[in-house]
């Protein structure tokens, strides 16, 4: 496999786009490689400008549960496109999508559509602070909630990939209201509550930005109880896990009903769409009926809303979708672990529905500190080997992988064969 055209494209891009990419992780810096420049995607596959094709386990970082260029979703987007790209006015489709989202998640009375996960979490926190009338928030080490200033503290994902727990340019006045607790550790949460005037707590119930690290059930249930005790708003960030891990996101696994929740990725099917929602008494503080301001020129964009509706309709029709995706994720993770074990390579694997992760680590990963102990050099070698064998994995050990509906058992088995070849070459130093 060659990447000559991608190398040239990357060099050209770096002249006019900062770092050559429009989101840092795409630069392949942590795996010391050149990112393939993508020409198109179809189903489970990506095709690059060098005529290489890859089985894609990134799926645009999660949104594409039905794979690339799904015909039904594509056709509905084209129909919507012919009616106009944006109106800046209400449409019936927005209401329909809101009803579909609400019907899937307990405790959700009303939602507000926005353009990105960052907007959703930022707005949810503003709303929670207004409701609680308290300024401090608790977040967790390794959880990523977008790139708004107060949340870029020990944020996992891209920040960790580039060796920094936070971001430059965040004023201390912002970060001083952010208390950071240890994931899966209720004692550290209790300490944070005792330190500050905490108005809200935000967490990924299935963390996907320090690698895949699910919350322990007793931890999440206990967190809800602490929020009730201290009268703090609990925000579950399900931008990644919502409609991915299951139809009801994390609730399938934990049964925890938050005060507010954020969704993104799958509900936009690859177009810019996210939302936040929760109890009516909190949501009704939003403008235009309340005093919490939030707005967006392209919020509820008809193309994105149409893509989201098409996706949710298709999900709901397919009664065995999540069980099939879960089975494929288990087949993949168990196969990878078995292959690594045969070469005496320490590998931890796990999945939640169609989300999966693996760590080159001796022990199970339960929090951010555990994730940081992983062998990132081994990951970089493995990633490079797999890429050149036609397997497109997330280019950081602190990211999550995704199964999509067009994938088959035969594809997964082929990937395991290629993983076996890769481990063999790594051990032999080839």
From Swiss-Prot:
EC number: 5.4.3.8
Keyword Cytoplasm appears in the UniProt entry: yes
CDD domains xrefs: OAT_like
GO CC, one annotated term: cytoplasm
PROSITE patterns membership: AA_TRANSFER_CLASS_3 (PS00600)
Molecular function GO labels: glutamate-1-semialdehyde 2,1-aminomutase activity; pyridoxal phosphate binding; transaminase activity
Catalytically driven reaction(s): (S)-4-amino-5-oxopentanoate = 5-aminolevulinate
Subunit structure: Homodimer.
Xref: NCBIfam families: hemL, PRK00062.1
Protein name: Glutamate-1-semialdehyde 2,1-aminomutase
Lineage: Bacteria, Pseudomonadati, Campylobacterota, Epsilonproteobacteria, Campylobacterales
